[in-house]
């Protein structure tokens, strides 16, 4: 057996190659993060191994720094094992009491872990392509968060420039109101606008939801508004709305790409009443291959939804808190999905109500419902069967 440990960095990668006895087959070496370096690593691995040797290549999950070398190794049909940095760090500390941590030591630690009896599963080509879905869902999440902050800015600016507007419309974040404020960013500008122009904007952009009488009400309110006349704030409002519109267009494009992947996957969890398309996509992207988890509890732990445990002598934690050490994206998707599933699925609605009746806080009861949902998701994805409602 030949075990290759790679410590990944931005500009270079440190490598260590051991045989089945743990003896270095070659001195630890460093390769640059480019194609010449990758080919040099591949050639060294081939020189150190025989055709009958089983080769294992291990590296840490270091985010985007490992994407390129991981793809190269998979393209060359090498079995790759991606490790949790927490595991490798603890394993390194268990090998020596000395506080020695260098890139080459880390590379040797990874290679040694491959030789041990640690339960590791190889990184499949399917998992590599699953990164596409993960990248898209995380990218969408960040864009939505960015847009939410800009919407808060719009609310703040409207409160300064035309505070009465919020009482006249169902939402100031609708397409028609954005169109109105883009052209007339303030009470003063609206009060001086021609009524026909105001009505045309509202009727056209709201698809008939608003009519001329709404334009009249808005202009009348603008003429008696207490809003400040601040050209700088009006300019900021116009630009902020433009940024929101651009972000919305980008989010729609991202969602189209996600939908294409989801249409190919046809995941069983979409059959759960209340399970949203976006939450399902993020859950699948973050978990990846469910066969990597031998129980639903492992999925919960990966999401950081497991309860922490502390016991020392007679002291035992009475109020255990959530670990929150896993994927924050998965944790967010699970809790968002649970809220909607509890609303639309009678079984989960009853379960949530039962937990609250036991005296549990809503968030605690929701966490119990999340565990129940994870068990259901795990069962559906493992079996490949759609959800069947209990009658």
Which sequence ranges carry the predicted segments?
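A detector of single, family-specific signature residues
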Residues: 1-391
């Amino acid at each position: 057996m030949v075990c290759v440990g790679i410590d990944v960095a931005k500009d270079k990668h440190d490598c260590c190659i051991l045989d089945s006895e743990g003896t270095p087959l070659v001195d630890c070496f460093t390769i640059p993060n480019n194609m010449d370096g990758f080919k040099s690593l591949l050639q060294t691995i081939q020189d150190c191994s025989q055709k009958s040797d089983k080769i294992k290549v291990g590296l840490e999950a270091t985010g985007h720094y490992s994407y390129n070398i991981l793809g190269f190794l998979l393209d060359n049909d090498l079995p790759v094992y991606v490790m949790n940095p927490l595991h490798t760090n603890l394993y390194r500390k268990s090998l020596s009491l000395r506080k020695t941590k260098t890139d080459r030591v880390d590379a040797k630690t990874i290679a040694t872990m491959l030789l041990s009896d640690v339960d590791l599963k190889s990184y499949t080509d399917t998992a590599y392509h699953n990164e596409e879905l993960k990248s898209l869902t995380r990218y969408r999440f960040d864009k939505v968060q960015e847009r939410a902050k800009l919407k808060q800015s719009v609310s703040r600016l409207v409160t300064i420039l035309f505070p009465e507007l919020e009482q006249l419309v169902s939402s100031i974040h609708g397409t028609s109101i954005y169109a109105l404020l883009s052209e007339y960013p303030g009470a003063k500008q609206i009060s001086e606008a021609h009524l026909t122009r105001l009505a045309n904007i509202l009727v056209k952009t709201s698809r008939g939801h608003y009519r001329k009488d709404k334009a009249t009400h808005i202009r009348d309110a603008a003429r008696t508004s207490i809003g400040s006349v601040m050209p700088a704030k009006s300019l900021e409002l116009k630009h902020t709305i433009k940024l929101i519109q651009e972000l919305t267009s980008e989010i729609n494009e991202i969602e189209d790409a996600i939908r294409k992947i989801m249409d190919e996957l046809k995941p069983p969890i979409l059959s759960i009443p209340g399970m949203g398309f976006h939450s399902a996509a993020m859950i699948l992207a973050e978990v990846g291959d469910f066969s990597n988890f031998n129980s639903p509890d492992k999925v919960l732990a990966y999401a950081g939804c497991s309860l922490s445990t502390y016991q020392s002598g007679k002291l035992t934690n009475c109020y255990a808190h959530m670990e929150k050490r896993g994927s924050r994206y998965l944790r967010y998707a699970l809790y968002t999905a649970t809220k909607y599933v509890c609303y639309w699925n009678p079984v989960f609605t009853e379960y949530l109500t039962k937990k609250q009746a036991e005296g549990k806080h809503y968030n605690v009861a929701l966490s119990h419902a999340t565990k129940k949902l994870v068990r259901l998701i795990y069962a559906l994805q493992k079996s490949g069967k759609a959800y069947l409602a209990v009658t």
